[in-house]
Amino acid sequence: MVQRISLKNKLLPDLVEIQRASFKWFLLEGLTEVLEIFPKISDPTSRLELQLFGNEYKIKFPRYSVRQAKNRDKTYSAQIYVPAKLTRKDIDLPSKNQEKNIKSLDLSSTHLQLSAEKQIKNKKYKKRLVFIGDLPIMTNRGTFIVSGTERVIINQIIRSPGIYYKQEIDKNGKQIYSASLISNRGSWLKFEIDPKGEIWIRIDKTHKVNAYIFLRAIGLNKDEIEKGLSKYAFLISASQIYSVKELAKEIGKNNIEEVTDEEALLIVYSKLRPNEPATVAVAKQMLYSRFFDPKRYDLGEVGRYKINKKLGLNIPKTFRVLSPQDILSSIDYLINIKDKNSGNLDDIDHLGNRRVRSVGELLQNQFRVGLNRLERIIRERMMICDIDSLSLSNLINPKPLIASVREFFGSSQLSQFMDQTNPVAELTHKRRISALGPGGFNKDRAGFAVRDLHPSHYGRICPIETPEGPNAGLIGSLATCARVNVFGFIETPFYPVNQGQVIYHNSPVYLTADEEDDFRVAPGDVKVSKQHYIEGDIIPVRYRQEFITTTPTQVDYIAISPIQVISAATSLIPFLEHDDANRALMGSNMQRQAVPLLYPEKPIIGTGLETKIARDSGMVVISRTSGHVNYVSANKIGIQDNSGRTVHYRLKKYYRSNQDTCINQRPIVWVGEKIVVGQTLADGASTDGGEIALGRNILVAYMPWEGYNYEDAFLISERLVYDDLYTSIHIEKYEVECRQTKLGPEEITREIPNVSDNSLKDLDRNGIVVGGSWVEAGDILVGKITPKGEADQLPEGKLLRAIFGEKARDVRDTSLRLPNAAKGRVVKVRVFTRQKGDELPPGTNAMIRVYVAQKRKIQVGDKMAGRHGNKGIISRILPKQDMPYLSDGTPVDIVLNPLGVPSRMNVGQVFECLLGLAGGYLGKRFKIIPFDEMYGAEASRALVNRKLKEASLITSNKWLFNDQHPGKMQVFDGRTGEPFDNPVTVGRAYMLKLVHLVDDKIHARSTGPYSLVTQQPLGGRAQHGGQRLGEMEVWALEAFGAAYTLQELLTVKSDDMQARNEALNAIVKGKPIPKPGTPESFKVLMRELQSLGLDIAVHKLKLFEDGQRRTVEVDLMSDSKDNRVDRSNYDTPPVDDFEQFLY
């Protein structure tokens, strides 16, 4: 097993290679490719010509380093310069006399041409470098810094360009055969044979044209069609119904074979543009631009490769538009499927038909869009502006390209704010594969087939790691050993097998899903002898998407490892094969949410990939040279290499991550230590000794305890709090801008009106909090005053100044204060001003950023989880002495509910905790590879029992292993000291503290902001909102008959503005609370109905003096104290009433 783990680590690729390799391809090939197809642009008179030399582009060194870009909110980018040449052609037009002489002379055309050439004087200009835009540069960790934040471009999996054949059933239950020809860019073509046997070609899913007519229109004559089709008679007979019904109407012919090329072109044009007059030249141009023009249509290298492979063609891969041969062969293949049942139908969900677009290709497409905009702008300028005044600088405007790239990085679905909670989250984010985004699926319309697992996913896309919500199956993760080839297809490695013997000495063979289909492939957990022969008579294999069995001699390939099927995060789960897939999915996803702890600890039970994942995530510092350590401090490590040169490595100290967790690197080498290339020099967040350390190994017991672990709740010992086992640091960023207002500039100052000296104790002389200060909710971080206008001032202030003529400072306090429920230590203060050379937004004079670090101990309400999907909320923290304890007096750290195991079927947690217990007593750590049945039946159970027995013998603790109840032991109640009735499963499990902390979620409101329109309290913690009393809560109160409580909740406590104020006064003065009025939201509803033209009003019955009851309209919009006149009705008044206004 040890040998297999070391071998596997060598075979694992660099886990972030998919990002780096793609961006490298973009810089070397992708950008050149898109710049080279930029056309020569001439003005309408052909006097001016612009040419770009894309293959000679230059990239300037980035202006800011990665660290500076992050600190200053800048983009880590480089400027792109392209050599360009602007050529002016001065044409001397001949005079009238010269024209007469030319006409009278009988000269040959060649002579005329030569004389015209002499009159054109070319003014050639040298090539000059022109700035065309900024390109964000990828950091060595595979991320981009955009406006100071770290972002990741995730990989997109889309339908590959090519041709796909399928068989469908129409609504009448009859079969339809169709073929879709999908391009990378341009129109789609669909060939179909309908239930009547007619062959049609659909262009862009709408316009339908007869197949024979289309073949004639693209320039094939009758003989070429007959020669190219093996079933020419089928095509002609399929067109008979069309000939009789439609052809006669269109061109007056009954035989389709008599149609000429020109007639066919006009028919196709009339179908595509039915309301436009058709000419042969226009029709030809339109058809050419649709399918044969490289600017408008592109199959891509992949599309050409797939079409050649499917149809058996030998068209060069550089020919990336359609050829008549493609269309003819496509129809021939379709007829053969229908008529002979030869040829293969395609499965669109097969990974051979789906390809990955990584960052390089996505950026290339965005550059193409930007360059198209640039071309359009250049042409417009050439037409509008005076040609003599044009130069390269005012012709080529970098803005369209800059805007296009900014749009992609800022708002594309595939450009995401990096998940930096811990190294696993970071690495998984870079290896994520999404079927969403431009050109992909929509999560609302994606069906089950797209989301489902497919046999071709084996070793390519992880079957376990995917989200739980509406994106399930649409977002996945690349498997550990998978890589993406030049065409974008995912490959996975296999060892070849020859006559039952596995050939290990060669490098493994990487196969795509298409190539793998033709071979019998055995899984990685098949037992192999020391002589490398496959053991056993019957071997399970995959062959042509089916799971079958065969003999060892018939096996063609074998998987290199059992973990090549799963993703990096899933491969960290030990005993994975004993967990239900749903729970393993939760375990994989929750590892990404684990908060980096103050004192991380590597797991006793691992899988062997912890070191690889920590290294590839970029969280640890790795030596680039061999040598010895000559300097170590908390901030820097110096390594002297063999040539005597010292290389310094700067460490990150208390950096804030995107998720407000703390990134802090700690040296793990000492002065004088010898170092080799690739050795880990410093640990980062969630790493310990160069290995991933997301949580802690703690003692768990599976037993009920007074109902405190009901419904997955956890009961924990106060040891976890006092010993800081689950304490984490969180760093919040607070920012304030000092702006230039109409009334004057805002000021950062210590002189704040109406503030006590005690509130200013932590501020320096400029009014900014001092680093290292302890601050609590409401404390001033930055003192700021804003000029106040006359309108802002209170009436008493105006009166005082009117009387005494006193000109007090007309300012108001707009200081930055620490928000509610926050406290901590100020770790960093950054001040940005123009005087220091910082770039600030217009109207901003200064910007101050304060970073506050907070230590959060574990508490009731925090969420914890294991690696097997066993999650729960802490319900109670018990004193150490009250916790159940073992026979040697060790108190348990956490009590879990045993009922959480059987129904969830995640038995891996039991194996893990028991082997962890043995490892804790033996002082050993174990690396367990999943799928260990190759070592024999019940291998996991045998290993756990053996190690427990070994631990009980070595430590002389016989209670550790009980033959009658293996894995269970006597546990005592900490409160009484008496043993519990039954033996209890106790072990050492690896538990994580998740980012869902109660401090970030707990919320209460007494008074707060209200919505302007409805006058109801706002919702949500961020807005300091209230809890919504919704429909169902109203039903509950109605059912209970709590009428007055309900009325109060719907009026005074909600949106009855007048009653709200009156109630407050009544409470203050100790008077009875008055009756509520009409809620504001009811008035809004009334106004909305009135705005629709409905005469809607509220009436009340009133008793008049004559003893009659009549309805009187109530004006809800007026204050109840106002005696306003009732709203008039809409009856027309008599004419007499208007006579007084006539004169």
UniProtKB/Swiss-Prot annotation:
It holds the Pfam family RNA_pol_Rpb2_3. It is found in: Plastid, Chloroplast. Its main location: plastid. It comes from the Eukaryota. PROSITE patterns: RNA_POL_BETA. One of its GO terms (biological process) is DNA-templated transcription. Keywords: Chloroplast, DNA-directed RNA polymerase, Nucleotidyltransferase, Plastid, Transcription, Transferase. GO terms for molecular function: DNA binding; DNA-directed RNA polymerase activity; ribonucleoside binding. Its EC number is 2.7.7.6. PANTHER family: DNA-DIRECTED RNA POLYMERASE I SUBUNIT 2 (PTHR20856). In plastids the minimal PEP RNA polymerase catalytic core is composed of four subunits: alpha, beta, beta', and beta''. When a (nuclear-encoded) sigma factor is associated with the core the holoenzyme is formed, which can initiate transcription. HAMAP family: RNApol_bact_RpoB (MF_01321). DNA-dependent RNA polymerase catalyzes the transcription of DNA into RNA using the four ribonucleoside triphosphates as substrates. This is DNA-directed RNA polymerase subunit beta. It comes from Pyropia yezoensis.
